[in-house]
Amino acid sequence: MNVLHENDHSKGAFYVEQDGQRKAEMTYTWAGTDRIIIDHTEVDDELRGQGVGYEMVFASVQFAREQQISIVPLCPFAKSVFNKYPEFKDVL
């Protein structure tokens, strides 16, 4: 599963496309220059249960580590993933 990323420095998204259509998306907004707030995660029914949501959260963690920023997971799904993976605490 290839997770793509768009970022315009005020908001952004990690997403998955299939046949040229966005089938999953996790959106965020920037809070200053050193923090993003994950506010929503959505996965089309046809991709549910395949770990796509997890892959988008994992991509956000990699991005945060590379950029040396922190994440505030307001989205209930993202928050649940962060709770399951204590090794992600470094970006919270």
Can you annotate each of these PLM segments?
Residues R35-D44:
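Conserved acetyl-CoA binding element of GNAT-fold acetyltransferases
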Residues A59-L92:
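C-terminal structural segments of small proteins and small subunits
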Residues G12-K23:
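Conserved beta-hairpin
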Residues M1-A13:
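Active-site rim helix/loop that mediates acceptor-substrate recognition in acyltransferases
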Residues L47, G51-M56:
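Conserved acetyl-CoA pyrophosphate-binding loop and the N-cap/start of the following alpha-helix
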Residues N2-L4, E25-Y28:
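Short, surface-exposed charged micro-motifs
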Residues D19, M26-D34:
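A conserved beta-strand-loop-helix scaffold within acyl/acetyltransferase catalytic domains
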